[in-house]
Amino acid sequence: FGAGGPIDGKGGAVMEIKNLCKAYGDLPVLENVSFTAGVGVTALWGPSGVGKTTLLRILLGLEKPDSGELMGTAVRWSAVFQEDRLLEGLDALGNLRFALGTDYEEAKAAAMLTALGLTWETGKPVREWSGGMKRRLALARALLAVSDAVALDEPFTGLDEENRRRAELCVAAAAETKPVILVTHDRTELNLLRANIVNL
């Protein structure tokens, strides 16, 4: 498959995928997928089992396609996966400090936690948190990281309506300055995020 550096395109496009194919044995998962993604939200949309997560992993360089071209995807990514992968013994700021390293800024971290409705929980170890709170912390970590693009695999799973709205607003803010690739099977959030939809 082909790969290249960032590309410049109309509307600030920074990555382009052409005729991407991937199969596991005799089972085709992705067939001739093509799209461009620039600043804003690009949603990989479709029901379970159509290859959304596989495509995201290919963009991140975690899997290789069988054929096709990837241009502009060799950038610094931050991500939320389906598993949150948090340090259970640390509190919110401890998790962010560890993950972000020299990029950690406490004022920005505190502001992001406030935006996501997590301020009163910041002193508790993550092991005492609910699944929805952990999900929001994982999102905070990805959005605070210094990156060129953000990959989000079902980031709003397990959130109630109020906290889902908080999370969507934070994602929308990030998408004003960089590409956000969002995996989802729920169309309700796509209008709010003004997403360009890739149907799989």
Where are these regions (language model features)?
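Conserved structural motif at the start of ABC-family nucleotide-binding domains
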Residues: 15, 30-32
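Conserved ABC ATPase "signature" region
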Residues: 104-121
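Q-loop/switch helix immediately C-terminal to the Walker
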Residues: 89-104, 108
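Helix-to-loop junction immediately C-terminal to a conserved catalytic motif
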Residues: 60
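ABC-family nucleotide-binding domains
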Residues: 153, 160
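Conserved ABC ATPase signature
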Residues: 125-133
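Walker B catalytic motif
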Residues: 125, 154-155
